[in-house]
Amino acid sequence: MVIELAELKNFAKIFLTGIYENLERIIFGSGRYTSLEMRNAILTGTVKIPKTVIEELCIGCEGCANVCPTKAIEMIPIEPVKITDNYVKDKIPKINPEKCVYCLYCHDFCPVFSVFNEISPIHPRDVGEEYIEIDISKLLQKKIEISEEQINKISSLLSINLRRIIKD
């Protein structure tokens, strides 16, 4: 992996700003955001990154990768898994925690909530159960009713996003 000098400078600036702004909380464990356990993990470099994608639940639609503003999600090929008669999953998302800014666009866009595995407006990181069993084939076989108005709104939003992606 080749890192350009500008990217390295930008990363260093963000890193140093973060340390400076959070120094008291990191060292003394003060404030409500950093517990003693988290402080020790930060200082020793042993912070565990939580599992963000439930691979068994994912349908491999690539929506999360397409919507990610930092391109932190890469679709990794897997052995094909038949989900329905007409659909086979052949890749799953892998999130790069160094690029991810936890904007949760992927979570909001995922049709089965396999990214961060939470259906809620609160930040899902480290919240709730680690694993929920769901039969994906039943989810995809259920008929979805969408009004004409909703279809028009969705197609309008998609066309705006496609234009933005093409410009990038």
UniProtKB/Swiss-Prot annotation:
Domain called 4Fe-4S ferredoxin-type: residue spans: 48-78, 91-122
Annotated SUPFAM superfamilies: 4Fe-4S ferredoxins
UniProt signal peptide: none
Keyword 4Fe-4S: yes
InterPro entries (UniProt xref): 4Fe4S_Fe-S-bd, 4Fe4S_Fe_S_CS, Fe-S_Ferredoxin
Name of the protein in question: Uncharacterized polyferredoxin-like protein MJ1302
Pfam families recorded: Fer4_7
Stretches assigned to coiled coil: none
Species name: Methanocaldococcus jannaschii (strain ATCC 43067 / DSM 2661 / JAL-1 / JCM 10045 / NBRC 100440)
UniProt keyword terms in alphabetical order: 4Fe-4S, Electron transport, Iron, Iron-sulfur, Metal-binding, Repeat, Transport
Residue sites binding [4Fe-4S] cluster per the record: 58, 61, 64, 68, 100, 103, 106, 110
Superkingdom, natural source: Archaea
Keyword Transferase on entry: no
GO molecular function: 4 iron, 4 sulfur cluster binding; metal ion binding; oxidoreductase activity
